[in-house]
UniProtKB/Swiss-Prot annotation:
Family assignment from sequence similarity: Belongs to the chlamydial CPn_0422/CT_273/TC_0545 family.
Protein name as catalogued: Uncharacterized protein CT_273
Region Disordered: start-end pairs: 121-142
Basic and acidic residues composition bias: residue spans: 130-142
Species annotation: Chlamydia trachomatis serovar D (strain ATCC VR-885 / DSM 19411 / UW-3/Cx)
High-level lineage: Bacteria, Pseudomonadati, Chlamydiota, Chlamydiia, Chlamydiales
Length: 188
């Protein structure tokens, strides 16, 4: 940073000559400083070029440089920033249902039919179902003594399927509901 006293003398000379020119101009047209300010208010020029918003500047969404160690997928920069799904890489809701059924059937085979899971994310009012399912599963684990490996598989499978079902799938349903309500509001 350059401080004021570190400037060369030519800067001071230029400043004084510029001030002298401005003062001479004011004397020629016989205007005071307040009148010049009033003229400047009327001579404003509007800048019509679009500027990035503060949010896009802060989040740096306008930058196209690759900062990762891999290149982005094709048309990555052209796609929309938000998607209607919480985790779009898991696929559509139908594909998520198929994957959950595959996991459930695989765990059922491994535990010799002792594993069972039923989806609860089909409706928007699922709080009562969730609490009753948790009570039933807790009683189920207490009543039956499973082998250690089967018990671990059942618990991990239940946790995984609950995360997919109640976390991601139900969130996707709520996002779809909100988006549909927004479209209804915009259209009508």
């Amino acid at each position: 940073m350059v401080e004021i006293f570190n400037y060369s003398t030519s800067v001071y000379e230029k400043h004084s000559s510029t001030n002298k020119l401005v003062n001479d101009f004011r004397k020629e047209i016989q205007m005071e400083g307040a009148a010049i300010r009033d003229i400047a208010k009327h001579a404003q020029i509007l800048d019509m070029t679009p500027k990035p918003s503060a949010l896009s500047t802060l989040m740096q969404t306008n930058k196209k440089t690759c900062w990762a160690s891999f290149s982005p997928p094709t048309n990555f920069h052209k796609q929309r920033f938000s998607t209607p799904y919480l985790v779009p890489s898991l696929g559509s809701p139908d594909k998520q249902d198929q994957d959950m059924e595959k996991i459930s059937s695989y765990l059922k085979v491994l535990t010799r039919g002792k594993f069972s899971y039923r989806s609860t994310a089909d409706t928007l009012s699922r709080k009562n179902k969730r609490s009753s399912d948790q009570k039933r599963n807790g009683q189920h684990f207490e009543q039956e003594e499973l082998e250690v490996e089967e018990e671990v598989l059942v618990r991990e499978g239940t946790v995984l399927l609950r995360a997919l079902d109640q976390g991601i799938k139900s969130s996707n349903l709520l996002i779809d509901y909100v988006i549909s309500r927004i479209f209804q509001f915009v259209q009508g």
